[in-house]
């Protein structure tokens, strides 16, 4: 997996203590500041060299590629799909934050450029993607006229797919794998 934060340091050396973010609001804010510094524009720019590397790797299968993002990287999925529409055939986002915002560069505004299949999955109870967005995002994606499925996983919270998290939801996590692998199989023939 690429390190989205390479500009700001290396894993476990980003200026906050990851083990303390749940009990120390200052550490949590430092983490959010770092997350906000990694803009969609920067990640989209970083994606081009990765695509070039894959295209030149003799062990990589030729043809379109897929990508998956969780949490904050969910918005990047929309951004890279819109920027590189001829290369991404399958895109999945799980409890993606920031897919639709009030900003002029909100990822949903460029979604109409996506040519591949897009799957957006959300937690039913997500403080970072509140209920009104869960209603609005499907409407925005339908308006974009793209091949997109939006699904809300009932009884889940943000981070439900990760077994090491207290919010882990086994049934939803298994369904998330089923949906992702089916998406890749339809579009990438894995």
List each language-model region with its residue ranges.
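N-terminal cap/leader regions of alpha/beta-hydrolase-fold enzymes
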Residues: 1-190
């Amino acid at each position: 997996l690429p390190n989205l934060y390479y500009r700001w340091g290396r894993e476990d050396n980003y200026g906050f203590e990851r083990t303390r973010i749940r009990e120390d609001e200052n550490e949590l804010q430092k983490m959010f500041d770092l997350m906000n510094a990694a803009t969609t524009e920067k990640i989209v720019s970083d994606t081009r060299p990765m695509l070039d590397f894959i295209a030149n790797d003799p062990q990589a299968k030729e043809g379109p590629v897929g990508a998956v993002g969780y949490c904050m990287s969910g918005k990047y999925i929309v951004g890279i799909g819109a920027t590189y529409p001829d290369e991404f055939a399958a895109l999945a986002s799980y409890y993606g934050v920031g897919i639709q915002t009030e900003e002029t560069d909100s990822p949903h505004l460029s979604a109409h450029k996506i040519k591949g299949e897009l799957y957006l999955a959300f937690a039913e109870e997500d403080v970072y993607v509140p209920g009104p967005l869960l209603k609005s995002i499907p409407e925005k994606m339908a308006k974009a006229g793209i091949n997109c499925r939006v699904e809300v996983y009932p009884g889940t919270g943000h981070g439900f797919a990760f077994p090491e998290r207290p919010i882990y939801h086994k049934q939803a996590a298994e369904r998330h794998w089923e949906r992702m692998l089916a998406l890749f199989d339809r579009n990438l023939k894995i």
